[in-house]
From Swiss-Prot:
<comment type="subunit">
    <text>Homodimer.</text>
</comment>
<dbReference type="InterPro" id="IPR015424">
    <property type="entry name" value="PyrdxlP-dep_Trfase"/>
</dbReference>
<feature type="binding site">
    <location>
        <position position="263"/>
    </location>
    <ligand>
        <name>pyridoxal 5'-phosphate</name>
    </ligand>
</feature>
<feature type="modified residue" description="N6-(pyridoxal phosphate)lysine">
    <location>
        <position position="286"/>
    </location>
</feature>
<comment type="function">
    <text>Catalyzes the cleavage of L-kynurenine (L-Kyn) and L-3-hydroxykynurenine (L-3OHKyn) into anthranilic acid (AA) and 3-hydroxyanthranilic acid (3-OHAA), respectively.</text>
</comment>
<keyword id="KW-0378">Hydrolase</keyword>
<dbReference type="GO" id="GO:0030429">
    <property type="term" value="F:kynureninase activity"/>
</dbReference>
<feature type="binding site">
    <location>
        <position position="147"/>
    </location>
    <ligand>
        <name>pyridoxal 5'-phosphate</name>
    </ligand>
</feature>
<dbReference type="InterPro" id="IPR010111">
    <property type="entry name" value="Kynureninase"/>
</dbReference>
<feature type="binding site">
    <location>
        <begin position="174"/>
        <end position="177"/>
    </location>
    <ligand>
        <name>pyridoxal 5'-phosphate</name>
    </ligand>
</feature>
<feature type="region of interest" description="Disordered">
    <location>
        <begin position="53"/>
        <end position="72"/>
    </location>
</feature>
<feature type="binding site">
    <location>
        <position position="326"/>
    </location>
    <ligand>
        <name>pyridoxal 5'-phosphate</name>
    </ligand>
</feature>
<feature type="binding site">
    <location>
        <position position="354"/>
    </location>
    <ligand>
        <name>pyridoxal 5'-phosphate</name>
    </ligand>
</feature>
<keyword id="KW-0663">Pyridoxal phosphate</keyword>
<feature type="binding site">
    <location>
        <position position="146"/>
    </location>
    <ligand>
        <name>pyridoxal 5'-phosphate</name>
    </ligand>
</feature>
<dbReference type="GO" id="GO:0030170">
    <property type="term" value="F:pyridoxal phosphate binding"/>
</dbReference>
<dbReference type="InterPro" id="IPR015422">
    <property type="entry name" value="PyrdxlP-dep_Trfase_small"/>
</dbReference>
Length: 486
């Protein structure tokens, strides 16, 4: 489904023009890469916080600084994406429709509308979201929040028996995923100590999970496992798992496979339909730029979303069991209020309540930009710009060998095994000092205690010059931290 990058680039990354070019360490070289970047124009489609904004203690627009602001270095799209310029317009149009139409806004069309009437906004979100994750439109629903959606999906896909009751998950999964899996196992009266299989790194100095190790874990627990739930991209290390291979192998053992795509959607070129993934869920406030806590999304493969109307009211199951709500019901009968639930086919049949139209406007404002850019082009730039970041981190300054640097990169070096993010592990005792210098220079990244920072150039709004400036400041921060530590 959707567009794909050339196979060689997916496997090995693109040819990097700066590997043997000493000019790559100059700001002019970074600026030349920006001048050639086909996505460079999208930077102007986002609101970049200024250095002054980051220090302000008020939000009153009448107290804006008089002089021209200096943009910050925002490399934190893996945590919270920046606001598209168009978001304000989308929300203003929604507020106007609500103000002028009230309840009739659910059905009234407008000649200049940015979204359909309230009753159909979820369909608009699914239409734009599907190509981003490589899905059919019917396989995607924009709804809920990430952990809520994981529970909704596991309520349907995790149907444990005395023989098959385990869920396999990475040992350092994002805590909310861990809690969700643990509570699902408890909910079905199993003990998580036995029912929860945690995949840990084989080498604790290298916190990534080799595909072969994951495959062996699946084989070891195959006869007793019901579901495997992994992160498409691991939030801490930035590792991009081999979704296609892991999914196929687990399914060959009779295991249902789900993926948390929070750090993958809008970041890498997913093909959830073609990879035969059973189910997936993701948030939209990271690379998809919908705002804090924005409406999330889920994926249900078409084979699981079928509704057999001929079996309704028979002893056979006409559709997959699920937690049900009125917004997942057949649109033709939704407002009859007859309490006879027949779901819409596909992922839409897993919806519970009508979506927040306010939130959906913020989601769609960003998704329209992805439609213009395409995931293939976004991934292509991501491979280049994150490769450039890695090159500068490891090789600048020229007189410092990488083994003598006060940090290591724990994200896989193979571009096919990562997205935009690089996770950088500092030597003990340096993190707070480094963060202080970065903050003083209006560099926005995030940290994971005790010693890791995560840096993620977002292809739609970050530039090669951003990356060059970050590496310069980061080197300075490391030198100051080493002196402060003594």
């Amino acid at each position: 489904m959707g567009s794909r990058l050339h196979t060689r680039e997916i496997q090995n990354g693109p040819p990097l023009p700066y590997n043997d070019d000493i000019r790559a360490f100059s700001k002019e070289y970074a600026e030349s890469l920006d001048a050639q970047d086909p996505l460079h124009r999208f930077r102007n489609e986002f609101v970049i916080p200024s250095k002054e904004d980051l220090k302000r203690t008020t939000l009153d627009p009448n107290q804006e600084p008089e002089h021209s602001p200096t943009p910050s270095l925002y490399l934190c799209g893996n945590s919270l994406g920046l606001q598209p310029q168009s978001t304000r317009k989308y929300i203003e149009y929604y507020l106007r429709a609500w103000a002028t139409k009230g309840v009739t806004g659910h059905f009234v069309q407008h000649d200049d509308q940015l979204l359909p009437p309230f009753v159909d906004v979820d369909a608009a979100g699914a239409r734009l979201m599907a190509p981003i994750v490589g899905a059919m439109e019917s396989e995607v629903a924009v709804m809920g929040t990430l952990t809520t959606n994981l529970h909704i999906l596991m309520a349907s896909f995790y149907q444990p028996t005395q023989e098959r009751y385990k869920i396999i998950i990475e040992g350092k999964a994002f805590p909310s995923d861990h809690y969700a899996v643990e509570s699902q196992i408890k909910h079905h009266n199993f003990d998580p100590k036995d029912g929860m299989v945690l995949i840990e790194p084989e080498d604790h100095t290298r916190p990534v999970l080799d595909t072969e190790h994951i495959i062996r874990t699946i084989d070891e627990h195959a006869s007793s496992t019901a579901v495997i739930l992994l992160s498409a991209i691991q939030y801490y290390t930035g590792q991009y798992f081999d979704i296609k291979r892991i999914t196929a192998h687990a399914q060959s053992k009779g295991i249902l496979v789900g993926w948390d795509c929070a750090h993958a959607a809008g970041n890498v070129d997913l093909q959830l339909h073609d990879w035969n993934v059973d189910f997936a869920a993701w948030c939209t406030y990271k690379y998809l730029n919908s705002g804090p806590g924005g409406t999330a999304a889920l994926f249900v493969h078409e084979r699981h979303g079928r509704v057999n109307l001929e079996q309704v009211n028979s002893e056979s199951e006409p559709f997959r069991p699920r937690l049900s709500g009125w917004w997942g019901g057949d649109k033709k009968t939704r407002f009859l209020m007859d309490n006879n639930f027949i779901p819409q086919p596909g992922a839409a049949g897993f919806q519970l309540s009508n979506p927040s139209v306010l939130d959906m406007n913020a989601v769609v404002a960003s998704l329209e930009l992805f439609k213009q850019a395409s995931m293939a082009e976004i991934r292509k730039k991501s491979l280049h710009i994150t490769g450039y970041l890695e090159h500068l981190l490891l090789n600048y300054p020229l007189d410092t060998p990488s083994e003598k640097k006060p940090f290591t990169i724990i994200t896989p070096s193979n571009p096919a095994e990562r997205g935009a993010q690089l996770s950088v592990r500092l030597q003990p005792g340096l993190l707070d000092h480094v963060l202080e210098t970065l903050e003083d220079n209006a560099v926005v990244i995030d940290e994971r205690k005790p010693d890791v920072i995560r840096v993620a150039p977002a292809p739609l709004y970050n530039t090669y010059t951003d990356v060059w400036e970050f590496c310069r400041i980061f080197h300075e921060a490391c030198q100051k931290a080493l002196k402060a530590r003594g």
